[in-house]
Amino acid sequence: MSSTEEKFSLKEVLVSFKACLIDDDKDVILEHYVNGWKGLVRFMSSLGTIFSFVSKDAVSKIQIMESYLAGPNGERYRTLQSMVEYELSSDLVDLTKRSDHTDSGCRTLLRLHRALRWLQLFLEKLRVSNEDSKTSTLCTEAYNDSLANFHPWIVRKAATVSFIALPYRNTFFEIMNVGTTEEVVAMLGESMPYVTKVYDFTQEVYSQHNLLELP
């Protein structure tokens, strides 16, 4: 069983995203970021094919990032800041149109970054929801406020239709393998601030370097 097929554990995601942040939250360790994403892929995969339009792309992006981390310039990809500085100074990023660097680390991570925003919003909505909340509505709202802005109409339509098949809130909480509803809510409350910090810092770095709209 591969690392992305193992059972989802919310606690492992918490540990990974907490470990991401270094230097007083002024940088992100990419190995831990990738590990956190592996956990999120397991979360999506545990729901069958509903989130496959995101999880399949995430898996390919994870593999690209792992190849950089394990490659001859792996130290350059140790943190978000070092990756951005290295790729920009070495002209390894397609800034205005796709050309020779479609799989650059900066572009690859940007795609994961956008998807992280959707999952961040959705999981936070789950955390503050009540037993009668419709998960399909929560997920659609989170999607419309994030990933939908980067998808063509046909993908947006297919995504919102697939969300209708999402299970009840209690089923989501069982998938998280934490314990009771109260324990899941507490764990989400502990986890989401770290995910938010990682997202916000990445957004700030990409904004500073004008990388948020990479083709």
UniProtKB/Swiss-Prot annotation:
Q: MF terms per GO, please?
A: ceramide 1-phosphate binding; ceramide 1-phosphate transfer activity; phospholipid binding
Task: Tell me what reaction this enzyme catalyses.
Answer: N-(hexadecanoyl)-sphing-4-enine-1-phosphate(in) = N-(hexadecanoyl)-sphing-4-enine-1-phosphate(out); N-(9Z-octadecenoyl)-sphing-4-enine-1-phosphate(in) = N-(9Z-octadecenoyl)-sphing-4-enine-1-phosphate(out)
InterPro entries associated with the record: GLTP_sf, Glycolipid_transfer_prot_dom
Cell compartments where the protein resides: Cytoplasm, Cytosol; Golgi apparatus, trans-Golgi network membrane; Cell membrane; Endosome membrane
Keywords in alphabetical order, please. Cell membrane, Cytoplasm, Endosome, Golgi apparatus, Lipid transport, Lipid-binding, Membrane, Nucleus, Transport
**Its topology with respect to the membrane?**
Peripheral membrane protein
Q: State the superkingdom.
A: Eukaryota
Gene Ontology biological process terms from the UniProt entry: ceramide 1-phosphate transport; ceramide transport; intermembrane lipid transfer; negative regulation of autophagy; negative regulation of interleukin-1 beta production; negative regulation of NLRP3 inflammasome complex assembly
Q: Name one Pfam family in it.
A: GLTP
Tell me which residues bind an N-acylsphingoid base 1-phosphate. Answer: 57, 61, 107, 111, 151
What's the main place this protein lives?
A: cytoplasm
**Keyword Transferase set for record:** no
Q: Which SUPFAM superfamilies does the record cross-reference, listed alphabetically?
A: Glycolipid transfer protein, GLTP (SSF110004)
Keyword field contains Ubl conjugation: no
Question: Which GO cellular component terms are attached?
Answer: cytosol; endosome membrane; Golgi apparatus; nuclear outer membrane; plasma membrane
Purpose of the protein? Mediates the intracellular transfer of ceramide-1-phosphate (C1P) between organelle membranes and the cell membrane. Required for normal structure of the Golgi stacks. Can bind phosphoceramides with a variety of aliphatic chains, but has a preference for lipids with saturated C16:0 or monounsaturated C18:1 aliphatic chains, and is inefficient with phosphoceramides containing lignoceryl (C24:0). Plays a role in the regulation of the cellular levels of ceramide-1-phosphate, and thereby contributes to the regulation of phospholipase PLA2G4A activity and the release of arachidonic acid.
Query: Its family?
Result: Belongs to the GLTP family.
PANTHER family, per database record: CERAMIDE-1-PHOSPHATE TRANSFER PROTEIN, GLYCOLIPID TRANSFER PROTEIN-RELATED
| Name of the molecule in the record | Ceramide-1-phosphate transfer protein
Gene designation: cptp
